[in-house]
Amino acid sequence: FVRLQTIIREMNRLGMMVDLSHVSTGTMRHALEVSEAPVIFSHSSAYELCNSSRNVQDDMLKSLAKNGGLIMVNFYSKFLSCSENSTVHDAVAHINHIRRVAGIEHVGLGAGYDGINFTPKGLEDVSAYPTLFAELLGVGWSIEDLTKLAGGNFLRVMQQVEKVRDEKKAAGVKPYEDHPNFRSDDPYNCTSS
């Protein structure tokens, strides 16, 4: 935990976003406790709707909201419906679930089209975003809400990450690179002293 804490503090000092997609729930929890800047999940979905270990559980979504961070919904069918088949309605369900649990300020789009082979029917690529937005408008989303979802929330997080960086610079916070000693005590590890 000490190394993770040091790495996250240094990322905050440098103005780097902490991306928690692909990490364990324990790492999520620790990162959310430590980070002074908002964190993101760049391409994850809601665990409550599809219990993939790549998705984010509700307690973590609530912690994310307290942190000011953002989860960007992944459109990989196996993370939406837990199968190779999904539809735009599955994506809408994840977006709405995250909105209910974390709030409109904390949900975005992180489709992942560049690395997935099973996409939702009706949402096969970004050219289908108007279909997604029409579905969301049909269930009560406003244009302002869609603006946040489509990139406004991400811009807010970027600005807040930079604000934390600027505050640390103004306070004279030095690099954390010497804390702790990252060299292994293992004599067979080539990085040991």
Regions found by a protein language model. Give the residues of each.
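Outer-membrane beta-barrel pore domains
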Residues: C82-V88, I116-L123, L137-D145
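Mid-to-C-terminal alpha-helical segments outside catalytic/metal-binding sites
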Residues: E124-S193
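Short acidic/histidine-rich active-site segments
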Residues: N74-F75, A102-V126
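Histidine/acidic residue-rich metal-binding segments in metalloenzymes
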Residues: F1-I40, S53-G69, H89-E105
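Conserved, mostly hydrophobic/aromatic
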Residues: V18, H43, I71, I98, ...
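A conserved active-site cap/scaffold subdomain adjacent to cofactor or substrate pockets
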Residues: A65-F79
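Active-site beta-loop-alpha junctions enriched in small/polar residues
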Residues: M16, S21-M28, S44-Y47, Y76-K78, ...
